[in-house]
């Protein structure tokens, strides 16, 4: 199944968090919080402006981003993987 985001939406594959502490202790799944970092696998064309044009997207496919994992972030399962659907405004930073 393919998914194509609309407007300023992004499809992000969440990156896994290391399950070891700095001291080398393996942490249980309950004590490891979900990562708020992921790789953009698809991006919309940009938000439509009042004049009919589209605002350009700063975030591009392939970027690794840090995002606000809160209200408005949707989770979708496809082909056994979990993807996030979020707005470009939910992205806090691009990791370079």
Swiss-Prot record:
Belongs to the GroES chaperonin family. One of its GO terms (molecular function) is ATP binding. NCBIfam families: PRK00364.1-1. It comes from the Bacteria. GO terms for biological process: chaperone cofactor-dependent protein refolding. CDD domains: cpn10 (cd00320). This is Co-chaperonin GroES 2. Keywords: Chaperone, Cytoplasm. Transmembrane segments: none annotated. It is found in: Cytoplasm. GO terms for cellular component: cytoplasm. Together with the chaperonin GroEL, plays an essential role in assisting protein folding. The GroEL-GroES system forms a nano-cage that allows encapsulation of the non-native substrate proteins and provides a physical environment optimized to promote and accelerate protein folding. GroES binds to the apical surface of the GroEL ring, thereby capping the opening of the GroEL channel. It comes from Vibrio vulnificus (strain YJ016). Heptamer of 7 subunits arranged in a ring. Interacts with the chaperonin GroEL. The gene is groES2.
